[in-house]
């Protein structure tokens, strides 16, 4: 009989014969285990920084004071906190109301790997670095990091970037009719 290479068959809703598989004696299947929806994956990923940043922002002055480094949060630190929270809240809302997923699920065991970037890098590393005495009120006094006009300029750039990103997500959403897996090029 015919010999087929071991390759994934693309097209979940298609019959094997529609994919060119005929007269096959053996079909190999792989159990990917429990599945989790992509929407849930994104919600869990983006929830990390939304939980971690407030904990660090509120807890850092208390923690550093215990080690003899009391400080108060500066305007730049508070601004970063607000922008990070707004960014990830936007991502959560987009996951619920904007994103349309081509695949319904992914293996549940991948959620830890997928969340590592957001929870560790965007959560702990960013939060731990920004909300420390090195950017506190006393440390930035008299520097450009204490210049409100300078900071507001970058807040405006951030806002324009977020709006551009939102526009891109809306464009992509409109390219995929609801309830389909259609992929189109903008």
Language-model-derived ranges and their functions:
Residues 3-4:
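Short, small-residue-biased leader/transition segments that mark boundaries at the very start
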Residues 13, 74, 78, 91, ...:
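Residue-level detector of functional hotspots within protein domains
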Residues 30-119:
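Alpha-helical transmembrane segments in multi-pass membrane proteins
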Residues 56-82, 125-152:
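Helix-coil boundary and interhelical linker segments in multi-pass alpha-helical membrane proteins
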Residues 94-117, 127-186:
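Cytosolic-biased juxtamembrane loops and peripheral soluble domains of multi-pass membrane proteins
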């Amino acid at each position: 009989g015919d010999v087929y290479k071991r390759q994934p068959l693309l097209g979940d809703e298609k019959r094997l014969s529609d994919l060119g598989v005929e007269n096959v004696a053996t079909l190999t299947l792989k159990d990917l285990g429990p599945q989790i929806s992509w929407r849930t994956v994104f919600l869990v990923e983006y929830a990390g920084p939304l939980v971690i940043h407030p904990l660090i922002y509120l807890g850092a002055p208390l923690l550093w004071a215990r080690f003899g480094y009391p400080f108060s949060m500066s305007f730049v630190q508070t601004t970063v906190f607000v922008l990070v929270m707004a960014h990830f809240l936007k991502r959560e809302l987009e996951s619920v109301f904007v994103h349309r997923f081509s695949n319904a699920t992914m293996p549940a065991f991948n959620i830890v790997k997928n969340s590592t970037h957001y929870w560790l890098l965007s959560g702990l590393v960013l939060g731990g670095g920004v909300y420390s005495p090195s950017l506190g009120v006393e440390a930035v006094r008299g520097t450009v990091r204490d210049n409100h006009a300078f900071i507001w300029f970058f807040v405006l750039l951030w806002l324009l970037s977020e709006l551009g990103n939102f526009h891109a997500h809306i464009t992509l959403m409109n390219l995929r009719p609801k309830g389909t897996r259609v992929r189109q090029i903008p």
